């Protein structure tokens, strides 16, 4: 049975169920949800969290889904075991205060054991073992009742294995797992603990949410405050695990949606999966990471150095690196990505629709990584050459870590290349530094997590309201309302006085809360009792709640007072113009660069905006000019900007663009600029394109691999910028005595003349330097048999000092020992260069030793080889002492 059929049967089983009732099939959410505690959706229940936490009323009593998930805590372990991967699909059924334990057990057992011919999965009952939480006798009784299994077949496990919580106060409860016995080839009989996971494979976990947890200290240490008012069901079944069982495969990497990638990798590398353990790990890494990275890019992630982008970059580069370790050094992703697309695209059709964008991002990252490998190889070669010259045999952990951390050079390649040269690598030191870096990252993550404020006060206010705060700002900028909640210092309060910072919740508001790239409104709220507050910021910390961050200017604010809310109109209009301009620039870039130029982020502020979008390489100036011209053409056309609410399906049919990573409901708001640009958007906008006045693009830059940023001005801000530019051009024209259109040519001529003058100055300076070299060589002092030039060159920097020293050495008498040390100083910075000929080195003299001796005297250090060495320092006052030291040191060694 192929994976698509397993998925179809799962959804159909719940959608058409008549035992507990039909479940609403819910499409998979994006891998990216607005959750500060999650990089990616990592469980099937994540999109339903607001319902389980009581933040929102569920729109259905029962639901079923097959959710895309990514888990990346141990990327480096992927492939080493065959049970886990970074991307997986989690099949689940959910009950929100409807059926409970018995219904969940019946539904799961029925699907798992029902014969294939009847639409089930046909697993043998004799190989199935239910597990329960050891303190849940109700579950034991229900499993016996539903399945008829004897009690000894029902496995009791502790909190670590069979009690679920979110790791924080909130809902929790015991769970039951369905374990599949793979037989004695995979482990001993009866070991249902962690060591027996290979044999007794968990295929389905049923979570019975029944408890309210007041404190959670660890997986096994928590306090149960009482029972939840409504009991819920959350189940999760790993699609890939069931697939490899039903397809008769040894592990998830061999199922129909993954193994074709391994087969293609076999074809490319000439190696065979199953022939070598290390190669097998690499094949599995390739299969997993290609699929994971493709799905992440599909949902809008782009490679970067932080957070989601960094995870994607690691996945892509590990896949490329694994192919290299398998012996394939050509671009691999263009060969592998289409294989995964064809398999996953049967279910996730957007992979085909967005293929140009997905492939462009992935292939560009591989190209960048291949360049990194080339530069890293150069650094590696330098490090090993120095190591061999020093007589060493082990590359230090510091050097291996620097190659990995600074140059992106994988440790596996460092180990492989070192072994080829007969060298070892200090892996212990490398791992220590890696662990220290991981710990710093964890500490940073904890610190950032701590910055997210406790939402309990907001939930308390939201519960008291009973309905979402009504946003009226699409239609008005002033409105009458009443104060329904006050929050200060993280807690609910009843009043606030002059000078107090307070968060105010009204029952309705014209103030726009920051979101969708648009900054929040500002303004004032006037209370019926004469009090007045200044609104500095507006946020929506929990769904349905709009919170005004304010300072009380006068009077006292208390719950129940009537309020007159006044938005700063000019600021709102300016931001709205920026937001409309962002939509227009987005559309213009897609026209100029193609459909791959999708928005990756934005910020709309008063009079200016920034717009991030997917693109490979810098955008040519000609394209920037075309985009700016196109946008301003639409401004002159004065197209009406209008918004309408429709179903998401109708919005897609209308051609409206949706932004990756944004979460949309069944009903969406579509903003259109005439019939030209159409996007899903919840922000505020200008009434027509003509209201923008003028749009000026300031420039574009890279903010990460495959992502460019454009910054621009709108309206009066753009006009003022252009006016300043006009004045500047007029001043330059007057100064250079040419017309404005002749300025580029005139400036070019001036720059060329300046360059020629600089070259002439350099020729004169070098000539003077070389003339001095002849005089210095002729005046060399005799220190025993050695011709010594120890010279102070004030005003000479490092490059000149080196040139002078080498030239003087070449002018000393042939066949006699010669030593040259030149010490220069510019702006207090000291440069030291020593140059020796072969005869001097034969007498035991060393440029490296001379520079190392001089370095501390001039407040620095240095070194190099025996023939040429250089150094620097910061204490020019002791240069004469250094010259004396050189003379003494040469005399001492020469005499010995």
Curated annotation (Swiss-Prot):
Biased composition, class Basic and acidic residues, residue ranges: 439-456
GO molecular function: alanine-tRNA ligase activity; aminoacyl-tRNA deacylase activity; ATP binding; tRNA binding; zinc ion binding
Cofactor note: Binds 1 zinc ion per subunit.
Class of enzymatic activity (EC top level): ligase
Domain notes: Consists of three domains; the N-terminal catalytic domain, the editing domain and the C-terminal C-Ala domain. The editing domain removes incorrectly charged amino acids, while the C-Ala domain, along with tRNA(Ala), serves as a bridge to cooperatively bring together the editing and aminoacylation centers thus stimulating deacylation of misacylated tRNAs.
Any GO BP annotation: alanyl-tRNA aminoacylation
Function: Catalyzes the attachment of alanine to tRNA(Ala) in a two-step reaction: alanine is first activated by ATP to form Ala-AMP and then transferred to the acceptor end of tRNA(Ala). Also edits incorrectly charged Ser-tRNA(Ala) and Gly-tRNA(Ala) via its editing domain.
Segments of this protein annotated with the region Disordered: 439-459
Catalytic reactions on record: tRNA(Ala) + L-alanine + ATP = L-alanyl-tRNA(Ala) + AMP + diphosphate
Subcellular localization(s) per the UniProt record: Cytoplasm
Keyword vocabulary terms for this entry: Aminoacyl-tRNA synthetase, ATP-binding, Cytoplasm, Ligase, Metal-binding, Nucleotide-binding, Protein biosynthesis, RNA-binding, tRNA-binding, Zinc
SMART domains assigned: tRNA_SAD (SM00863)
GO cellular component labels: cytosol
Principal subcellular localisation of the protein: cytoplasm
Pfam families referenced in this protein's UniProt entry, alphabetically: DHHA1, tRNA-synt_2c, tRNA_SAD
Binding site for Zn(2+): 579, 583, 681, 685
Cofactor (UniProt): Zn(2+)
Lineage: Bacteria, Bacillati, Actinomycetota, Actinomycetes, Propionibacteriales
Organism superkingdom: Bacteria
Name of this chain's protein: Alanine--tRNA ligase
Homology family: Belongs to the class-II aminoacyl-tRNA synthetase family.
Enzyme Commission number(s) from the entry: 6.1.1.7
